[in-house]
């Protein structure tokens, strides 16, 4: 049975996009597919969130876009990480690791006796 869909916490979509693109360049639909595939359908992103995020990341200089032929033979905008995009991803991962580590400590805390 597939996992139920989970809303992406605010502020994490950019990090997830950067991570997917660190694996290989992809077009928007391919990014959405990889997110869903890797997360076993828990993470699903709609176009209304994905494309504004891609535009924002490109404006910040973290992505570059090139028009290429897709698997279907149609032209598509393929995104890839820039050097500053890789640097930003490392920073985002470090922050995420610190936060999730702190949350884990809080969850693991036992009641006072």
Task: List where the protein language model places each region.
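Amphipathic alpha-helical dimerization/coiled-coil segments
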Residues: 86-113
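Accessory beta->alpha helical hairpin/"wing" motif in late/C-terminal subdomains of nucleic-acid enzymes
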Residues: 81-85
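N-terminal helix-turn-helix DNA-binding core of bacterial DNA-binding proteins
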Residues: 5-49
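Beta-hairpin "wing" of winged helix-turn-helix
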Residues: 58-74, 80
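Short beta-strand/turn micro-motifs at beta-sheet edges
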Residues: 3-7, 67-68
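A positively charged, amphipathic N-terminal helix/segment that binds anionic biomolecules
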Residues: 1-3, 79
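Basic amphipathic alpha-helical segments that dock to polyanions
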Residues: 50-57
């Amino acid at each position: 049975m597939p996992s139920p869909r989970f809303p992406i916490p605010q502020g994490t979509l950019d990090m997830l996009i950067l991570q997917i693109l660190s694996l290989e360049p992809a077009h928007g639909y391919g990014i959405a597919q990889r997110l869903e595939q890797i997360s076993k359908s828990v993470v699903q992103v709609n176009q209304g969130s994905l494309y504004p995020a891609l535009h924002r990341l490109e404006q910040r200089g973290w992505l570059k876009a090139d028009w290429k032929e897709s698997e279907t033979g149609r032209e598509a905008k393929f995104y890839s990480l820039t050097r500053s995009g890789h640097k930003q991803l490392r920073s985002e991962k470090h922050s995420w690791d610190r936060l999730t580590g702190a949350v884990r400590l809080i969850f693991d805390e036992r009641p006072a006796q």
